[in-house]
Amino acid sequence: MTPPETETETASGEGGETRTLYGSPEELPEPAREALGDLLLVLADTKRVLGIHYADWILGSPTLEAGIACSAMAQDEWGHGRILYAMLDDFGMDPERLEHERGPSEYRSSELLDEPTDSWPELLALNLLLDTALSVQIEAMRESRLEPLHHKVSKILDEERYHFEHARGWTARMASTDRGREATGEPFRKAWRACLRWFGSEEDELASGLAAEGIVDAGPGALRRRWVMRVAPSVAEVEPDLVQETEDGWGSAVAPDWEGWDPRTRRLRDAPGPDDEAILSRVRGDRNRSLLGE
């Protein structure tokens, strides 16, 4: 069988050498292909479950406009998840099974999403910190040498801009009162630590290998710094002890905690997974599939 032809391009910042463009995942070196499949599944699962958390606040939001925003963001995340699940067919995974047939321990969504979101400040922490972390990771694929990935992420990123603006506006609103700042403190501290860790360790060879292959444009440490720079000004309004401003810009005042961390799933190893009844049954669409006889 003749292998698919590939094109070439000149990489910037690397001395002008010619680098191969990959036309499909099958053309990737095996370690990079495996690492990218893991990453896409993490992103797909996290977006799908995050969509449920947004949907839960369509009717319970503080304002009508916020409820409408939650509806739009939920639809966005589900659409993005479907795009990513479909891509995993090229990595030897069954999108139908991924979407509808897995239990809690098989999901790779952030442990921040394992339990229902009980308060608006908790949802706001997910909106500003976790949602933006996903966007920073996906932005790193914008100029990917894997052409199908490069083309798919553009639509996702176009829709994600609104999510950040919504989060930034509501964080400023909460920061305007003592009660608001007090309410956001603990949710932001919890989400900050989880998201800081979510990008992975700079010593993670698989994640760093994706950057070396040009599948993403930066390794875990650089992506974490991008995320901090983006969200820190808003975080400083409600929980200033988490961040610090230096001559070089914003940084985290706390270091990532790697105890119990699984770099492949980007979850804590002892985290149980999303609640099966309250969250996953809806993610999978169990009730609707039962009505349809599936």
Annotated model-derived regions:
Residues 2-23, 44-45, 95-107:
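Acidic, low-complexity proline/glycine-rich segments
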Residues 3-4, 73-101, 167-172:
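Conserved alpha-helical segments that form or flank metal/cofactor-binding pockets of metalloenzymes
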Residues 21-41, 101-127, 144, 177-178, ...:
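Acidic/His metal-coordination segments adjacent to aromatic residues that form catalytic metal sites
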Residues 34-42, 61-80, 123, 148-160:
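Alpha-helical scaffold segments that form or flank carboxylate-/histidine-based iron centers
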Residues 45-48, 75-82, 128-132, 154, ...:
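Generic structural signal for well-ordered, non-transmembrane alpha-helical segments
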Residues 50-72, 134-150:
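Helix-loop segments that flank and shape redox-cofactor active sites
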Residues 113-166:
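Internal, conserved structured core segments that host functional sites
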Residues 182-294:
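Extended, helix-rich structural scaffolds rather than catalytic motifs
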